[in-house]
Regions:
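Short proline/glycine-enriched turn/loop motifs at strand-loop junctions of beta-rich domains
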Residues: 13-19, 27, 50
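Generic structural detector for well-ordered beta-strands
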Residues: 11, 35, 44-46, 69-71
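C-terminal tail/sorting-segment detector
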Residues: 56-72
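Solvent-exposed serine/threonine-rich low-complexity stretches and specific carbohydrate-binding patches
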Residues: 30-39
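Generic short beta-strand
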Residues: 20-23, 57
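Short, surface-exposed loop/turn motifs with a glycine/proline- and acidic-biased composition
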Residues: 38-60
Length: 72
């Protein structure tokens, strides 16, 4: 996954169906959810609603959790 121009891009190397992705701003508890559609391998999330400043984020993909810091 990488961040660019207000969006998080998540690339899957194979098709993942019935996968739910959530990005949570730990500071504000803002959550952005996305359900992966059939055949979708590149997910683009607009995270502009998370707010400016340093965001401690949690990305949940099904049962896997990843943590990161974004400076917006």
């Amino acid at each position: 996954a990488y961040y660019q121009n207000g969006h998080i891009y998540i690339n899957f190397d194979r098709c993942v169906n019935n996968t739910k992705i959530e990005v949570t701003n730990i500071n504000t508890n803002s959550v952005i959810s996305h359900s992966v559609n059939e055949g979708e391998t590149i997910i683009i999330l607009d995270i502009s609603s998370l707010g400016c400043g340093t965001n401690y984020i949690e990305i949940t993909i099904n049962d896997d959790v990843f943590y990161g810091i974004l400076d917006l």
